[in-house]
Regions:
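Structural motif
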Residues: 102-108
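Bacterial N-terminal signal peptides
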Residues: 8-15
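N-terminal hydrophobic or amphipathic segments with adjacent small-residue motifs
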Residues: 15, 61-63, 114, 165
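Extracytoplasmic
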Residues: 45, 61-63, 107
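Short N-proximal segments of mature Sec-exported proteins
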Residues: 109-123
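Long, amphipathic alpha-helical surface segments
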Residues: 2-3, 7, 19-58, 70-74, ...
Length: 178
């Protein structure tokens, strides 16, 4: 019985501490601190979102992916034992490169860069093997009603993957600017 009491006491203390912390550290409007991610620049939001969902690729089983999901290209000499600082630097360089590639899309360039980091820019822009995506076609036609097209990049081997769908929705919420 004493273990149950101890558990209930710890649970109550945790709840009180959480409520106290939210009141003490919330913003002027009373919103929770988690919303402070929206105060970051879009590129930083994209990087943090990518790190969260991609996870750390620090083992040999992840090869040819290292760091926060960077695919090692021919001529690169990265290994799986890079530091997190090196992984962060590689991710930022990759995202900046993709932002430059999609810069003609203005405020949507970060959203497209985040998606292209995972699916590859050729899946969006098209290549000899892939047609141009409907997402890019809509943006080129200056139609920014792209939610459905963005979320459509949620399949693996033709099947919808719920975790990828959740990721797309979070990316859209964090990075789409009206």
């Amino acid at each position: 019985m004493s273990q149950v009491r101890m558990f209930v006491i710890i649970l109550l203390v945790s709840a009180v501490a959480t409520v106290y912390g939210q009141e003490r550290h919330g913003t002027e409007t009373g919103t929770a601190p988690q919303l402070s991610i929206y105060k970051l620049p879009p590129l930083e939001r994209a990087i943090r979102c990518t790190k969260y969902y991609e996870g750390w690729h620090g083992e040999k089983k992840h090869w040819p992916y290292v760091g926060w999901g960077h695919k090692v290209l021919p001529g690169e000499s990265f290994t799986n034992d890079i530091t997190k600082a090196q992984g962060d630097s590689i991710l930022r360089a990759d995202m900046m490169k993709l932002c430059r590639l999609f810069s003609r899309f203005g405020r949507d360039s970060t959203l497209l860069s985040c998606l292209a980091y995972q699916v590859g820019p050729y899946r969006l822009l098209g290549s000899k093997d892939f047609p141009k995506s409907k997402l890019i076609q809509k943006l080129e036609a200056e139609n920014r009603d792209i939610y459905k097209e963005y979320i459509s990049f949620r399949c693996y081997k033709g099947k919808v993957v719920p975790s990828i769908e959740r990721r797309r929705k979070v990316e859209y919420l964090l990075l789409f600017e009206e």
